[in-house]
Structure formats: C-alpha cells, structure tokens
A protein has these predicted regions:
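A detector for small-residue-rich transmembrane helices and their helix-helix packing motifs
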Residues: 2-266
C-alpha cells in the first residue's frame, strides 16, 4: 500500500508539474528566479528536506517500517537526555507527521529562500556571481548562502527541541520558523504557500487513506488529538522566523508591509 501510494502520488505530481512546465511555466519560473536561485533551484530547502527525510528513513527505520518508525530514542524527554534534545527537532512520529512537515517545509521554504536569495542584494540590486567565485565576504558567495538556508532551518529545529516544554518530536518548529520568515518578507507568496501545502497534504491523505471510518468506543475519556501538539515549539519557531525576517528587511532597508503581513498571518 505504501509503494502504491508513493507511486500514484509521484505520478500525479509529475503529471501536474509537466503540464504546468510545458505551458509557459518554465519560462515564467526562469524569469522569476533568474536573479534569486542558482539554476532556478531552491537548493537550501531541498537539502534540508532531503536530510530530514533521510533521518526518518534510516535513523528511524522508516524505510523498513514506514508507518511505525523508531521514535522513543529521539524524543526530548528531559534536558538530562541530550540525545533526545539534539534529535527531537528532526525526528517524526509517523508517516503522516513527516509528510505534513516536509510539504510545509517545501512550500514555505521556497518562499523564504527566494526572499533570502542565493546572490547578495545591495541597494536594491542583485549581485550575481558564480557558485564558488571568490567573494569579499565568506557569507556572500552563492554556495555559502545556500548552506546558510539549511543551517538556519536546522538551528531553529534545534532551538525548539531545546526550549519546548515537555517531550517533543518533529520538524514543525522549524516549519513554523520558515513560515514566519516567509510571511514577513513575502506575505502574498506565503499565502500561496499555505494553499500549496494544504493541497499536497490533502492529496497524500486521500491516496494513503481513501476510506475513513468513524467508530464509537466505550471507555474512559481520552485527551483530544490537539493535546499532543507542541504549541509552544510552533510559537517559538514562528517568532524566531518572524524576527529574522524583520532583521533582513531592516538590513536591506526595505519596508514592512504590515497590513499584508497581518492578513497573511491570519
């Protein structure tokens, strides 16, 4: 079932992508990203998603047990358990958990990385250089700026793993950080990212679990589903991302579209 779901989902996404790409999408994407991404690809976001997915597949044994990964060693049980504190921001509790976080990371990550850019901006202009060309600053080359995107995402994940209250698990703190950065710097594009992320998650759920059955069970009351959500980690990630976005706008002397940001946050 897992293989069939993955094949169908990949086929649907490939078909939609091919349709858009061959009907003017390629030219529009090149025009949009020519001075923002190296070869038009958000490398930093893709690298982060690939590494987190690899952690789920190999460290958590998700490749062998997709729906029932290894989780207990990676939970941030306590500050006296450093392994959990360091890994909780990258581990996930289920297939749906990682799919949801990775689709969100991809959708918002593209927007955030576009706002950051692989090429430095000075006085409203983009300075384009080759990927590994010598730079006046070690952080101004495209290669370094790409790695900074991945490093920033991982830093927020680690931060939320350290300061979240109670046992935690998941990359969602970093996803909310990426979203906060994207909403502040590119609010309209962030709204489109919400739609894209929701559409991908809905498509995956429809393929993975097309039939939903409701049952009535007899027993003692149980906590609601939202009781297991680390709201404080989400909020911390969002605030850190938003502050980073404000700092970037201030450094570039760009204006903050406060009204648009307000409605994008809603």
């Amino acid at each position: 079932m897992v293989a069939l779901t993955a094949v169908v989902l990949a086929a649907v996404l490939a078909g939609v992508g091919w349709l858009v790409w061959t009907n003017g999408g390629a030219e529009h994407w090149r025009e949009l990203t020519d001075d923002r991404f190296v070869y038009g690809v958000p490398w930093g976001t893709l690298l982060a998603v690939a590494l987190v997915t690899a952690f789920y597949l190999f460290a958590q044994r998700g490749l062998w047990s997709w729906y029932d990964p290894l989780t207990l060693p990676f939970v941030s049980w306590s500050w006296f358990y450093p392994v959990g504190v360091l890994t909780s921001g990258f581990a996930h509790g289920s297939a749906g958990h990682i799919v949801s976080n990775m689709t969100g990371a991809l959708a918002f990550g593209v927007v955030a990385e576009y706002a950051w850019g692989h090429y430095p901006q000075r006085r409203g202009h983009t300075i384009r250089d080759s990927l590994l060309a010598p730079q006046e600053s070690r952080f101004s080359s495209p290669g370094a700026r790409i790695l900074l995107v991945t490093a920033a995402m991982f830093a927020v994940a680690l931060l939320t793993g350290i300061f979240s209250l109670g046992p935690g698990l998941g990359f969602s703190g970093a996803v909310f950080g990426i979203a906060g950065f994207a909403i502040v710097t590119k609010p309209r594009a962030a709204i489109a990212a919400v739609v894209a992320s929701s559409a991908l998650s809905t498509l995956y759920q429809a393929l993975a679990d097309p039939v939903v059955r409701g049952t009535v069970s007899v027993g003692s009351p149980s906590p609601p589903t939202w009781a297991n959500i680390a709201f404080q980690a989400h909020m911390l990630g969002f605030v850190v991302g938003a502050m980073a976005g404000i700092a970037l706008l201030w450094a570039r002397r760009d204006e903050l579209a406060s009204v648009t940001v307000f409605f994008a946050t809603l």
